[in-house]
Amino acid sequence: MQRLLTIFAAITFGSLITCSTVAADEPPAKEADAKPASIFPDANLEAAVRAEVFAKRYNDEPITPEDVANISRVVGKDKKIKDLSGLQHCKALMLLDLESNQVTDLTPIADLKRLQSVTLAGNKISDIGPLAGLTSMQLLDLSNNQVSDLKPLEKMSNLRTLYLAKNTLETIDPIAPLSKIWSLDISDNKIKDLSPVAKLGWLTTLDARGNQIESLSPIVELRELDMLLISGNKISDLNPLVEMCQKDAEGDRRFAPYLEVYLGENPIDEKAKADHITKLESFGVDIYDK
């Protein structure tokens, strides 16, 4: 009996050793594949993009390049967005509205060739160089930033609407070739010369308030104007405006009867101004002198 127990114990011990050896030789079980990281380092931007990704709109799964390859718009107003990294994957993007954020670098959107409408008003942008190749652009709003150089815009020949209010512009020369613009806001800058506007033949609205403009001569050939805002400049002579409106009134009456002019806070002689306003009103022009 004792011998049988000894044999049984030996067999059992040997089995344990064998099992242990086999277990030691087996490769460790694979860990579950880790989820891919989000392509958007800025969580606030990711949230704005997620709203356009139907499959992940209501969960927190990381967004991948494939998820955003075909989205056409991203809207994220006043969301404290700082970093646009990740947007470079949105190859089909046509509309981007990130008004009132903290964006400084536009590099991630430099190759989004389908962009037609970009609103970045109220950010911290000074360099618009990355926009230079976006020639499909039709609406661009850069109001309330720190832009001083418009050269990157000079090939945006499809631009219709351009808002540049409250920047640090001293010249608008680069926009002279952009003949399709019909609405231009350059208010509250440091602009002295309107000459580049002379070639914008389709211009209907010009907001140039709060600059250092002295002469209206460059606008005399603009035949589509219906709103002119020039308050708060250094204009002392309204003759160019009177002459262009008189010419229109005596001709095909294309714009004068529909034109609104805001000209308050300019150093215009009161008597001359009264005479000019009377003439302009006789042509059908609405004058606002406050």
Per-range role (PLM):
Residues 2-95, 108, 130, 152, ...:
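N-terminal capping/linker segments that flank leucine-rich repeat
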Residues 7, 13, 19-22, 105, ...:
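N-terminal compositionally biased, intrinsically disordered segments and leader/signal-like regions
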Residues 72-74, 96-98, 118-120, 140-142, ...:
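Conserved hydrophobic beta-strand positions in leucine-rich repeat
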Residues 97-152, 160-166:
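A generic tandem-repeat structural signature
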